[in-house]
Amino acid sequence: MSTPGAQEVLFRTGIAAVNSTNHLRVYFQDSHGSIRESLYESGWANGTAKNVIAKAKLGTPLAATSKELKNIRVYSLTEDNVLQEAAYDSGSGWYNGALAGAKFTVAPYSRIGSVFLAGTNALQLRIYAQKTDNTIQEYMWNGDGWKEGTNLGVALPGTGIGVTCWRYTDYDGPSIRVWFQTDNLKLVQRAYDPHTGWFKELTTIFDKAPPRCAIAATNFNPGKSSIYMRIYFVNSDNTIWQVCWDHGQGYHDKRTITPVIQGSEIAIISWEGPELRLYFQNGTYVSAISEWSWARHGSQLGRRALPPAE
């Protein structure tokens, strides 16, 4: 059975999440096309019609990034498939960001990935989306207007896009990793490091995934040329799978995590510990967003249904 609150959540909604340690924000689309925010501050709240931050085309992809929740950016598509930005800055609240004014039109089936560049106090952003020629395009904000960045090459039409960013303690700039799916259904990585720029090679992390499966990624504990990454995707068994990158081991440990509805979107956040929180739809109240939690003592389902579902 559903609940009145769950019925407000779009089935197969885009999902995005940001955090500052265990202060959490989750974004989703309601059945009328509005983007809402649910939050966790020692308890779950919001997610109602009073917590709308933007309006987007129905079925829009969602991506979000933040700097300690002082600056939050949430990305979606307009009815005309133009990239748009809902922006929050502490002290000024929510407003429409400058991105829509740049008029970057993407493929109607594009997904979105987004990151603030790590290791700098400056507000520098990178967005990844799929153009109508099916290439993955980077869009950059360095404080002086939105511009096109590097083109990462052709991907499967409608591919999921995962992205994460950190700064190694011994590097003088940010590192970026982007994951997407190729026409042969492999899940692949493109890598950027400050001393090399974008690596030309594609690194395969999974040989065959369902076409257009959702992809999400996070990292934790950046150190001296060392990083820990977790990449998630929805596999053909309708469960979320996790692929681990651990320092000294590379990619290893590919396993199923938790069941979801077919075609569920996913979002992942992490913080020191490490602590991981994964958001998805698994059929609870039909369309509620649910949470999976990982900490040192093990993994379990977290909140069964985020507000407004219950």
UniProtKB/Swiss-Prot annotation:
Annotated binding of beta-L-fucose 4, by residue: 177, 189
InterPro entries, per database record: Fungal_lectin
Gene3D superfamilies: Fucose-specific lectin
Region feature (6 X approximate tandem repeats): 1-310
Keyword set includes Secreted: no
Membrane spanning stretches: none
Induction details: Expressed in iron-deficient culture, but repressed in presence of iron. Contains two GGATA sequences at -470 and -193 bp, consensus DNA-binding sites of GATA family transcription factor sreA which regulates siderophore biosynthetic genes and other genes involved in iron homeostasis.
Binding site for beta-L-fucose 6: 44, 277, 291
Residues noted as binding beta-L-fucose 2 in the record, renumbered to the chain: 73, 85, 146
Residues the entry annotates as binding beta-L-fucose 5: 230, 242
Pfam family, one: Fungal_lectin
Practical uses of the protein: Lectins have particular value as specific probes for investigating the distribution, structure and biological function of carbohydrate chains on the cell surface of animal, plant, and microorganism because of their specificity for defined carbohydrate structures. AFL is suitable for detecting core fucose on cell surface glycoproteins.
GO molecular function, one term: carbohydrate binding
Keywords: Lectin, Repeat
Binding site for beta-L-fucose 3: 126, 138, 198
Top-level taxon in the UniProt lineage: Eukaryota
Intervals holding Sequence repeats: 1-53, 54-103, 104-151, 152-209, 210-256, 257-310
Binding site for beta-L-fucose 1: 25, 37, 94
Domain notes: Has six binding sites that are non-equivalent, and owing to minor differences in amino-acid composition they exhibit a marked difference in specific ligand recognition.
Family as reported in the entry's similarity comment: Belongs to the fungal fucose-specific lectin family.
Role of this protein: Lectin that specifically binds to L-fucose and weakly reacts with mannose and N-acetyl-neuraminic acid. Has strongest preference for the alpha-1,6-fucosylated chain (core fucose) on glycoproteins among alpha-1,2-, alpha-1,3-, alpha-1,4-, and alpha-1,6-fucosylated chains. Binds to fucose residues of IgE in mice and human, causing antigen-independent IgE-mediated mast cell activation and anaphylactoid reactions in mice and is possibly implicated in allergic response to Aspergillus oryzae in humans.
Protein name: Fucose-specific lectin
Organism field: Aspergillus oryzae
Phylogenetic classification of the source organism: Eukaryota, Fungi, Dikarya, Ascomycota, Pezizomycotina
Gene (UniProt): fleA
